[in-house]
A protein has these predicted regions:
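Active-site catalytic loop in hydrolytic enzyme cores
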Residues: 1-72, 76-77, 86-93, 151-153
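Conserved hydrophobic/aromatic beta-strand scaffold that supports enzyme active sites
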Residues: 3, 29-31, 128, 135, ...
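A short acidic/small-residue loop/turn micro-motif
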Residues: 7-10, 141-145
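A broad, structure-centric signal for solvent-exposed, well-ordered loop/edge residues
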Residues: 11, 16, 135-136, 146
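CN hydrolase (nitrilase-like) catalytic-core segments centered on the catalytic cysteine
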Residues: 48-144
Length: 153
């Protein structure tokens, strides 16, 4: 179908910023057509624009994809995590952003986070969120699971 490159790269808040921001190439957002359904892709911080992870402003990429005709966004996550309080705050921030952005863009969001290390809670929930912002399929917050959900076009 195509290729998506990370759009909102992470980097330190120092001047100059360090991290992905200095190593990753970015490409314009694209929508792929799959028999009458517009599909988009986002990688990790592309979706939630965590202010602690990037010096760039929030470009609202889910809204941009909706404007380009996307109806479903596939979201791949490899978030940082730990057992501390701020990991819990990050989880809540990620979940709220997933739900709010699905609802605002009237989009389906299919999201999957890396589950390792499995002795800690994931950095964000995995599953499927409807255009109403509701979870219609969701995995446990910790450990490895597989999910399947049919989205009617």
């Amino acid at each position: 179908m195509g290729f998506h490159s990370k759009t909102l790269t992470c980097g330190s808040l120092t001047d100059p910023p360090r991290g992905e921001i200095e190593r990753y190439a970015v490409a314009p957002l694209r929508v792929y057509n799959w028999p009458g359904v517009g599909l988009g892709g986002l990688i990790c911080n592309d979706l939630w624009a965590n202010p602690g992870c990037t010096p760039q402003p929030d470009p609202h990429l889910t809204q941009q994809l909706a404007g380009l005709g996307a109806r479903i966004i596939f979201h791949a996550v490899n978030g940082g995590r730990g057992g501390d309080e701020w990991s819990q705050v990050g989880f809540q921030y990620h979940e709220a952003n997933l739900r709010m952005r699905a609802r605002a863009g009237k989009l389906w969001i299919v999201t999957a986070d890396n589950c390792a290390p499995d002795h800690w809670r994931c950095s964000s929930p995995s599953g499927v969120i409807s255009p109403d912002g509701d979870w219609v399929c969701r995995t446990a917050d910790q450990g490895e699971e597989i999910f399947v959900y049919s989205i009617a076009s």
